[in-house]
Amino acid sequence: MNINLTMIGQAIAFFIFVVFCMKYVWPPVIQALREREKKIADGLQAAEHAQKDLELAQEKVAKQLREAKQQAAEIIEQANKRANQMLEEAKDQARTEGERLITAAKAEIDQEKNRAKESLRAEVAALALAGAEKILETSVDAGAHSNMLDKLAAEL
């Protein structure tokens, strides 16, 4: 009988132990497992969200980089156009200035040529007058013979 009574006592003790565990031990363990499961699920969800955010950020960075490269290319193109335009303007200004200088030089040359002609005419007239005086051995009055001198100057 002792064996049966011992077994019954052990069964009752085991039953009390199981009830105690189910009432006081098992709920905190289950709650801890559920909390851990929730933390893991939240962590996975946060990781997925972070991965999506990372992909969006990478796409945004790539887009901004493309836009920046495009803007840089446009700025370089505009700078090249402006440089070419400035070069053409400088060429035009140099050409205009050269033409102006050539025109001024030609005008100055013409003036010098006319002055030289006038000077030569005056010298030739004086020489002709001196030659005529020597030929006639008389003094030729410039006032009296101005028509003759004008004709002579015009012919020269």
UniProtKB/Swiss-Prot annotation:
The keyword Ubl conjugation does not apply. One of its GO terms (cellular component) is proton-transporting ATP synthase complex. GO terms for molecular function: proton-transporting ATP synthase activity, rotational mechanism; proton-transporting ATPase activity, rotational mechanism. The chain crosses the membrane at residues 5-25. Its main location: membrane. It is found in: Cell inner membrane. It is a single-pass membrane protein. It holds the Pfam family ATP-synt_B. Keywords: ATP synthesis, Cell inner membrane, Cell membrane, CF(0), Hydrogen ion transport, Ion transport, Membrane, Transmembrane, Transmembrane helix, Transport. InterPro entries: ATP_synth_B-like_membr_sf, ATP_synth_b/b'su_bac/chlpt, ATP_synth_F0_bsu_bac, ATP_synthase_B_chain. F-type ATPases have 2 components, F(1) - the catalytic core - and F(0) - the membrane proton channel. F(1) has five subunits: alpha(3), beta(3), gamma(1), delta(1), epsilon(1). F(0) has three main subunits: a(1), b(2) and c(10-14). The alpha and beta chains form an alternating ring which encloses part of the gamma chain. F(1) is attached to F(0) by a central stalk formed by the gamma and epsilon chains, while a peripheral stalk is formed by the delta and b chains. NCBIfam families: ATP_synt_b (TIGR01144), PRK05759.1-2 (NF004411), PRK05759.1-4 (NF004413). F(1)F(0) ATP synthase produces ATP from ADP in the presence of a proton or sodium gradient. F-type ATPases consist of two structural domains, F(1) containing the extramembraneous catalytic core and F(0) containing the membrane proton channel, linked together by a central stalk and a peripheral stalk. During catalysis, ATP synthesis in the catalytic domain of F(1) is coupled via a rotary mechanism of the central stalk subunits to proton translocation. Belongs to the ATPase B chain family. This is ATP synthase subunit b. It comes from Hahella chejuensis (strain KCTC 2396).
